[in-house]
Amino acid sequence: MLNLKKVIALVCTLALVITSVSVVSFAEAYTDVTESSAYYEAVESLSKLGIVTGYEDGTYKPEETVTRAEMAALIARIQGYEETAKANANTVFTDVPSTYWASGYVAQANGQGIINGYGDGTFGPDDAVKYEEAVKMIMATLGYTPYAMNNGGYPTGYLAAAQFYGVTKGVSNAVTGTGANRGTIAQLLANAIDTPIMGQSKWSTDGSVEYTIYDGKDNNSYKTLMSENLDVVKLKGVIKESSVANLKGTKEINNDEAAKIKVAVTGNYDTNNKDFQFDSDGDYTGEDTFLVAESDAEDYLGMAVILYVRENDDNEYEVISIAADGTKNDIVTFTL
């Protein structure tokens, strides 16, 4: 352990050769989801955001099938509606009484047009949610129903939209017509919350509606569930300082202070958050110091990164997720 108040002249040159990017590091939350697990990054990120939870024995059970009621609850969480939707509510389905644990989630998702029943008045809350049903619910949540309906409807149009916009990226061994497991659902949700949402942008007097995908292109703003519903800000930049080192070779160390990183922010993905803005000259004037929290953000010193931060109860921003920026990193050399 370092107990020095100042570290000077630990002089060594480090050449960081980046051959693989898209790495997110956290302390493992579940005994059955290790770094070698296919859905490790997705499960860990969603756990940090409070979207998925594990079991009392410390496991996540990624191979266990998700039910339709559980999927309705997850849909509420990725929209930030957990508190309002979890209360018991009346539903239109004969097999989902107000006393059912997920009645509030089911009622809300049905009211939003995200979920449907079987056509006989039932919902089948304890039935396994099929892969294509889960994809449909997610893409409808993102606003892509008009796109899907113009490209084959259910399920073809929704599956096509999910593939085209990257929601199914990293999903393996998922088969339509079969129940989706917790690992697959985690990957879909992790992709979805960082996917540009689609929404109505223009209404005409003749009743026609124009839709926009808010992907930051063609003068459109950049909007995702993370930015609009979960209060998570996406940034890019270079980490220039950690709690123990910086790129100048000297660093004051305070053992009583929580670990932080300092970032030279180069992009804010058009966030509307006032704490992360550039001035009229293009100079960044926003927050640039973030709590490391449970991430391994300090391991990225000197690297170009994409990071996600969120304000905590103490009004400080902490790192939720971090990854090397594959479009920027090649070889970075610095001296400590």
State the predicted function of each range.
Residues 46, 109, 162, 301-302:
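Basic amphipathic alpha-helical segments that dock to polyanions
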Residues 68, 182, 301-302:
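Short, flexible surface segments
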